[in-house]
């Protein structure tokens, strides 16, 4: 996580600057001459986390797809025990193996990490 750094002499914000001679990253005050070496070369990190890709491909007639496995997990919305499931398609470091269940009764999408009763797969 990137944080703001402040000058220990004048309390102004420090800005990143490259030391081209020694090829290192410094944080430097624009008001006084204070500078400190950065512990990491990371200045800014922008992570986009989206949930839209996880359920990509879910269509109205997903229940008629014979290639999808079926389970008897109870739907939290309509309590039906007829659903199909698939694994998350996201490929992020923080993504664990999450199964997405699609209820064939009400088309509700729910995940395997929600607390529920025992599931059997067929």
Curated annotation (Swiss-Prot):
| Keywords from the named record | DNA-directed RNA polymerase, Metal-binding, Nucleus, Transcription, Zinc, Zinc-finger
* Subunit structure as annotated in this protein's UniProt entry: Component of the RNA polymerase II (Pol II) complex consisting of 12 subunits.
What this protein is called in its record is: DNA-directed RNA polymerase II subunit RPB9
Which PROSITE patterns would you find in this protein's record? Answer: RNA_POL_M_15KD, ZF_TFIIS_1, ZF_TFIIS_2
**Gene Ontology biological process:** maintenance of transcriptional fidelity during transcription elongation by RNA polymerase II; transcription initiation at RNA polymerase II promoter; transcription-coupled nucleotide-excision repair
Subcellular location as annotated: Nucleus, Nucleolus
Supply the InterPro entries for this chain: DNA-dir_RNA_pol-M_15_CS, Rpa12/Rpb9/Rpc10/TFS, Zn_ribbon_RPB9, Zn_ribbon_RPB9_C, Znf_TFIIS
The C4-type zinc finger ranges are 7-32
SMART domains, sorted:
RPOL9, ZnF_C2C2
Family (UniProt) = Belongs to the archaeal RpoM/eukaryotic RPA12/RPB9/RPC11 RNA polymerase family.
User: Does the entry feature the keyword Transcription, yes or no?
Assistant: yes
- The record lists Zn(2+) 1 as bound by 7, 10, 29, 32
Q: Which SUPFAM superfamilies match?
A: Zinc beta-ribbon
Q: What function does this protein fulfil?
A: DNA-dependent RNA polymerase catalyzes the transcription of DNA into RNA using the four ribonucleoside triphosphates as substrates. Component of RNA polymerase II which synthesizes mRNA precursors and many functional non-coding RNAs. Pol II is the central component of the basal RNA polymerase II transcription machinery. It is composed of mobile elements that move relative to each other. RPB9 is part of the upper jaw surrounding the central large cleft and thought to grab the incoming DNA template. Involved in the regulation of transcription elongation.
Zn finger (TFIIS-type) ranges are 71-111
Give the binding site residues for Zn(2+) 2: 75, 78, 103, 106
Recorded GO molecular functions are: DNA-directed RNA polymerase activity; nucleic acid binding; RNA-directed RNA polymerase activity; zinc ion binding
Q: GO cellular-component terms in the record?
A: nucleolus; RNA polymerase II, core complex
